[in-house]
């Protein structure tokens, strides 16, 4: 059996945010020293009431990676429908490298309409079917980014690379795995 700590950072007393982060760090360090298997951080936005006050589990994970040695670092969860999938894939991969392979990935579609409509109108919770399609497509892109050295994607919400982008970069010559060398049009990303 493994034990993980769900670090649902709340701020009912409306303390200064830096104090809340210091408490979260103390919990993280305690869990690592006490040999918990993992710690999980949440993602929520616009919570004026003090509930679920951590907006970026990946940034908190970077902080945890710098302060701990053994504990696995998870997100409960990354609301992937709110974020650009390429950026999300890069950020999670970078955290995994910085933590020396200690990342646990948790993903979700979101739960609060006030978050979705303000962070990505395509993720509006009023249209659950559309939100689920966005979730599936975003997850597909994340998996491609992590598994394939070069890839492309054309979907309902995202197209990578951007259509008809002509490679023009003096410091980086075109690469046949990314660019059609006859047209210089970018066909894959990496």
Predicted regions mapped to residue ranges:
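Internal, glycine-rich beta/alpha segment that forms the wall or movable "lid"
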Residues: 87-190
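Active-site-proximal loop/turn and secondary-structure-junction residues that shape catalytic pockets
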Residues: 9-11, 45-46, 79-81, 109-113, ...
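Outer membrane beta-barrel
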Residues: 71-74, 80, 88-92
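Active-site mouth loops of central-metabolism enzymes
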Residues: 9-21, 78-86, 190
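Structural beta-sheet core signal
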Residues: 5, 75, 105-107
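Short Asp/Glu-rich motifs
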Residues: 15, 50-51, 84-85, 114-117
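Glycine-rich "substrate-gating" loop/helix at the edge of Rossmann-like oxidoreductase active sites
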Residues: 48-53, 78-83, 127-130
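N-terminal beta1-alpha1-beta2 module of alpha/beta enzyme domains
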Residues: 1-72
């Amino acid at each position: 059996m493994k034990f993980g700590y769900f670090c649902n950072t709340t701020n009912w007393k409306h303390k200064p945010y830096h104090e809340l982060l210091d408490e979260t760090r103390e919990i993280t360090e305690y869990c690592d020293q006490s040999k918990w298997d993992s710690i999980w951080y949440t993602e929520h936005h616009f919570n004026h009431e003090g509930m679920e006050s951590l907006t970026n589990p990946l940034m908190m994970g970077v902080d945890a990676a710098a302060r701990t040695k053994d504990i696995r670092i998870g997100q409960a969860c990354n609301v992937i429908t709110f974020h650009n999938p390429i950026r999300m894939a890069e950020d999670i991969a970078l955290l995994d490298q910085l933590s020396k392979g200690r990342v646990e990935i948790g993903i979700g579609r979101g739960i609060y309409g006030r978050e979705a409509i303000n962070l990505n109108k395509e993720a509006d919770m009023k249209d659950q079917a559309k939100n689920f399609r966005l979730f599936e497509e975003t997850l597909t892109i994340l998996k491609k980014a992590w598994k394939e050295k070069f890839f492309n994607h054309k979907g309902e919400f995202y197209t990578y690379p951007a259509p008809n982008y002509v490679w023009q970069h003096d410091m980086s010559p075109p690469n046949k795995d990314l660019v059609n060398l006859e047209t210089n049009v970018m066909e894959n990303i990496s």
